[in-house]
């Protein structure tokens, strides 16, 4: 911009004039300069579209083409790259759940139900079972809706400390209590003898490191691993304590609710995302899995505006002595731009004079000085609830399909296909989209189709020893 402004003509009273350094030149020289200037103006008038703001249009077109190519490269890079970076954690979460369901009988044994599903499905008639499952699903979805609205209201009114405490308590339960139960059942299944002191040390280290990585700072891979683990633990709890028909109904209804909550103008999840974007804040890492690092430090401040102003003032105070020292250094070391160099430049192109018109013209030029998004902030973000319900679907399919791997793999592939289509729509519409509807719909269709059509067909083929 500095080099470009040196060649900008001055616009005064609607006429284009230039200042030349030699005021002692004769009238003949002045006339010759005027003639050359008039000839240059005629050439510009003959080619009116040749220059714009001192830049040829060909160069501008090249810059636009380069920007478009860079945008396409970024779309491909941060599109396909982050699709793969989301496939891996979703796959890992579902693999952990399925492996646990297949090996640890504790999570397939019916020992009770959640308090949110009070109606039992152990009934004499199918109609009564269907009614009880509908009531259980309605209560569960109502609890989810109320909790979501409460979270949005707290975030809307900047109750960050309340939300943070809520999430910390939830993380403590998952990382310590449910992890202790999970580890104990795994040791029982594989007949591993372990004393309580060693188990306590393992759980303590696991939980403390997880709390630090999730709610403060930690390596990206470690944070992602903990988010995957707590999602798998929560999914295992749902798989164990949700009745079969209730679980399928909840999955169907939660996908519809996710669609409404994200896409409706007054949907709670949409309001949450829009509020975070308006405040230029990241959502809590305990709620969101990101393919890039998300740290949460100093969000729970009572007056973020005042904090921002104070930080700006402190920045200016710190920059003032630095600028003074830089000026002193510039006087001692001119970096090659000495007085002789400036005089030679003035002799070649004339003195550079700044006027309000020239400054306005320079400021009107396109600038690339806008703050670009930090590479760490790029990436696709997926809610932990999506991980949980994906894993619940695959885990329930694995637990209730009589040990059939075909149904489990069909649901697994269906969820990944739905996630891929969701990310494709995300790249097209470039706004927050629900991740559950497509994947859950495909998963439910594949589950019932495979369990009721494909598996009996394959059993008959195996019975009659037919090979296709």
Curated annotation (Swiss-Prot):
GO terms for biological process, alphabetical: amyloid precursor protein metabolic process; amyloid-beta formation; apoptotic process; calcium ion homeostasis; cell adhesion; intracellular signal transduction; membrane protein ectodomain proteolysis; Notch signaling pathway
Species: Gallus gallus (Chicken)
Annotated stretches, region: Disordered: 1-66, 306-378
Biased composition (Polar residues): 12-30, 48-60, 312-327
A Pfam family that the UniProt record links to this protein: Presenilin
This enzyme's EC code(s): 3.4.23.-
Molecular function (Gene Ontology), one example: aspartic endopeptidase activity, intramembrane cleaving
Any Gene Ontology CC annotation: Golgi apparatus
Site feature: Cleavage: 292-294, 299-300, 346-347
Positions on the Cytoplasmic side per record topology: 1-83, 155-167, 218-221, 274-381, 430-433
Family: Belongs to the peptidase A22A family.
Places the protein is found: Endoplasmic reticulum membrane; Golgi apparatus membrane; Cytoplasmic granule; Cell membrane
Entry's transmembrane regions: 84-104, 134-154, 168-190, 196-217, 222-242, 250-273, 382-402, 409-429, 434-454
The protein's name in its UniProt record: Presenilin-1
PTM remark: Heterogeneous proteolytic processing generates N-terminal (NTF) and C-terminal (CTF) fragments of approximately 35 and 20 kDa, respectively. During apoptosis, the C-terminal fragment (CTF) is further cleaved by a caspase.
Entry remark concerning the domains of this protein: The PAL motif is required for normal active site conformation. Substrates, such as NOTCH1 and APP peptides, are bound between PSEN1 transmembrane domains and via the first lumenal loop and the cytoplasmic loop between the sixth and seventh transmembrane domains. Substrate binding causes a conformation change and formation of an intermolecular antiparallel beta-sheet between PSEN1 and its substrates.
Key words of the record: Apoptosis, Cell adhesion, Cell membrane, Cell projection, Endoplasmic reticulum, Golgi apparatus, Hydrolase, Membrane, Notch signaling pathway, Phosphoprotein, Protease, Synapse, Transmembrane, Transmembrane helix
PANTHER family xref list: PRESENILIN, PRESENILIN-1
Chain ranges on the Lumenal side, renumbered to this chain: 105-133, 191-195, 243-249, 403-408, 455-468
Basic and acidic residues bias: start-end ranges: 31-46
Taxonomic placement: Eukaryota, Metazoa, Chordata, Craniata, Vertebrata
Disulfide bonds: none
């Amino acid at each position: 911009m500095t080099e470009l402004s040196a060649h900008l003509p001055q616009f005064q009273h609607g006429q284009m004039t230039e200042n030349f350094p030699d005021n002692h030149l004769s009238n003949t020289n002045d006339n010759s300069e005027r003639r050359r200037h008039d000839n240059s103006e005629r050439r510009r008038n003959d080619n009116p579209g040749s220059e714009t703001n001192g830049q040829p249009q060909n160069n501008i077109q090249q810059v636009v083409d380069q920007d478009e190519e860079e945008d396409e490269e970024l779309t491909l890079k941060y599109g396909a790259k982050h699709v793969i970076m989301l496939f891996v954690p979703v796959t890992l979460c579902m693999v952990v759940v399925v492996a646990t369901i297949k090996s640890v009988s504790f999570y397939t044994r019916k020992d009770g139900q959640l308090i949110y599903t009070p109606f039992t499905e152990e009934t004499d008639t199918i109609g009564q079972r269907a009614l009880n499952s509908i009531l259980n699903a309605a209560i569960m979805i109502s609890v989810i809706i109320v909790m979501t609205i409460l979270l949005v209201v707290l975030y809307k009114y900047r109750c960050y400390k309340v939300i943070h405490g809520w999430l910390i308590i939830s993380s403590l339960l998952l990382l310590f209590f449910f992890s202790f139960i999970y580890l104990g059942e795994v040791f029982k299944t594989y007949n591993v003898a372990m004393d309580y002191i060693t188990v306590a040390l393992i759980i303590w280290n696991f939980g403390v490191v997880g709390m630090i990585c999730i709610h403060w700072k930690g390596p990206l891979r470690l944070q992602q691993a903990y988010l995957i683990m707590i999602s798998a633990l929560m999914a295992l709890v749902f798989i164990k304590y949700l009745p079969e028909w209730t679980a399928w109904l909840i999955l169907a209804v939660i996908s519809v609710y996710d669609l409404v909550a994200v896409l409706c103008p007054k949907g709670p999840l949409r309001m949450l995302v829009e509020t975070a974007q308006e405040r230029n804040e990241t959502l809590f890492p305990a709620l969101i899995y990101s393919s890039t690092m998300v740290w949460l430090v100093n969000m729970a401040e009572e007056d973020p505006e005042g904090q921002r102003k104070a930080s700006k003032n402190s920045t200016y105070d710190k920059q003032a002595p630095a600028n003074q020292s830089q000026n002193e250094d510039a006087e001692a070391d001119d970096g090659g731009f000495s007085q002789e160099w400036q005089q030679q430049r003035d002799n070649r192109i004339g003195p550079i004079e700044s006027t309000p018109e020239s400054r306005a013209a320079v400021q009107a030029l396109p600038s690339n000085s806008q703050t670009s998004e930090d590479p760490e902030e790029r990436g696709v973000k997926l809610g932990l609830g999506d991980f949980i319900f994906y894993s619940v679907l695959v885990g329930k399919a694995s637990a209730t399909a009589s040990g059939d791997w075909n149904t489990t793999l069909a649901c697994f592939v269906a969820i990944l296909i739905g996630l891929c289509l969701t990310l494709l729509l995300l790249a097209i519409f470039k706004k927050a989209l629900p991740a559950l509807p497509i994947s859950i719909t495909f998963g439910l269709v594949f589950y019932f189709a495979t369990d009721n059509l494909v598996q009996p067909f394959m059993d008959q083929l195996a019975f009659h020893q037919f090979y296709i």
